[in-house]
């Protein structure tokens, strides 16, 4: 996919804007119930997406694989859905038994995306 590195960084910025807005809301209301969501939006969303984008820029051979595009969509969709579910879980802990297993499935998908990224780094980031 063309400009995949830029797409990772731009998507990371979206996660950052949402995460920081949530942080500002928590600070303004002094209600830190969603602090775990705030942290994961910034780490899984912004930090990892930006790191992925910079790596794809540094090693363009990684982008030549169709797995790079799979990695982007897998990570983006799975993290977004998992964090959406985390919002409901933190807001309504009694939903844990119903939401938890579904969220775990999406986190497993995000982990699969990270495994794809690791494979691409190990096999294509040689120069």
Question: Where are each of the predicted segments found?
Answer:
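Hydrophobic alpha-helical transmembrane segments of multi-pass integral membrane proteins
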Residues: 1-127
